[in-house]
Amino acid sequence: MSRYTGPSWKVSRRLGISLTGTGKELARRPYAPGDHGQNNRRKISEYGMQLREKQKLRMMYGLTERQFSNLFVRAGKIREGLPGTNFMVLLERRLDNMVYRLGLATTRRQARQLVNHGHITVDGKRVDIPSYEVEIGQVIGVREKSKDLKIISEAVEAVVGRPQFVQFDADKLEGSLVRLPQRDELEADIDDSLIVEYYNKL
């Protein structure tokens, strides 16, 4: 399955989440496209709830189905911790997500484009693979020739706050993962136990 590249607001309304992180998609019409209010929503089966939760998280991080399921398998091989939490931590460690968390991009989609176009470095070396897994202490920065990009400066200026598991130097436009995130620091509106149940039934 290919990565969805269409209008994010339609998916946001259908799944009941803000993929952009701004919440604007849900502000005016907090119901799915085609519905005319919450009364038209049909009761969802247990499987439907599991599937929707999986789709919410997959769309939130912008992964293909294959990327998403492969990462879940990897999380299941980690002996310590809960599978759902381990899965979400692996998602967080993706380079495109870390660029977003550091505030170098306003959305994960924008962060993925910055990585794809070669604007991002890891420990001083250009890395253009969004799925690159960031290790604790690695320095994520912006290429020297890309530091004047308006899209990056506007993103940094718009940051209200950053997660406690990252640190960022605004002058150098670089930061790092200082520790692995705790579950309560990640997406609160995601029930990862439903995702675990979904994949366990396959």
Swiss-Prot record:
GO terms for molecular function: rRNA binding; structural constituent of ribosome. Signal peptide: none annotated. The keyword DNA repair does not apply. The keyword Ribonucleoprotein applies. Keywords: Ribonucleoprotein, Ribosomal protein, RNA-binding, rRNA-binding. Disulfide bonds: none annotated. Part of the 30S ribosomal subunit. Contacts protein S5. The interaction surface between S4 and S5 is involved in control of translational fidelity. Belongs to the universal ribosomal protein uS4 family. HAMAP family: Ribosomal_uS4_B. NCBIfam families: PRK05327.1, rpsD_bact. One of the primary rRNA binding proteins, it binds directly to 16S rRNA where it nucleates assembly of the body of the 30S subunit. This is Small ribosomal subunit protein uS4. The gene is rpsD.
